[in-house]
Amino acid sequence: GSGKTEISKLIKKFISHKFGKTLIINGDDIRDIFDIKKYDREDRLKLGKKYTLLAKHITDQNINVIFAVAGLFDDLRKYNRKIINNYVEIFIKSDLARIVSHKKKPLYKKKNVGKIWGINLKPEFPKKPDITIENDFTIPLKRLANNLKKEIEKKFN
């Protein structure tokens, strides 16, 4: 809803050129591939740890991973930093009300009551992300992606 996947697609070529082979993994795609339907806190934590192990497995083969997921828990972010070399956390900050009003994702429909972070599940927003990009839906995603590229350049130069 915040633009994670689209921004990931827009920066992939830049990351590949600058840092080598790069793969985008979208959390929704992983859920679809493995038919994962549970969204409660416990299951999200378990899945998050699996995402981390998958990312580590790929990065250990010298392939960069852009993992487009909602990182909801401080414990998972700490785990990511501990397990993954060169881990960079990018927080796309968005207002939930705007996400819901702009998006037509099935997750935000009434049938999913009780499963939506920020509405029924309290997220733990990152306290110290490496990079923060604000998406208030007034700036085109292409420009946000360009801003992110500049921030990545600053971080690695």
Name these PLM-found stretches.
Residues 23-27, 61-70:
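Short beta-strand segments at enzyme active-site cores
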Residues 29-31, 71-74, 93-98, 138-139:
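Conserved nucleotide-binding/hydrolysis micro-motifs of P-loop NTPases
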Residues 93, 101-157:
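Small-molecule kinase domains that catalyze NTP-dependent phosphoryl transfer to phosphate-bearing small molecules
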Residues 2:
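ATP-binding Walker
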Residues 8-53:
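Conserved substrate/cofactor phosphate-moiety recognition/catalytic segment
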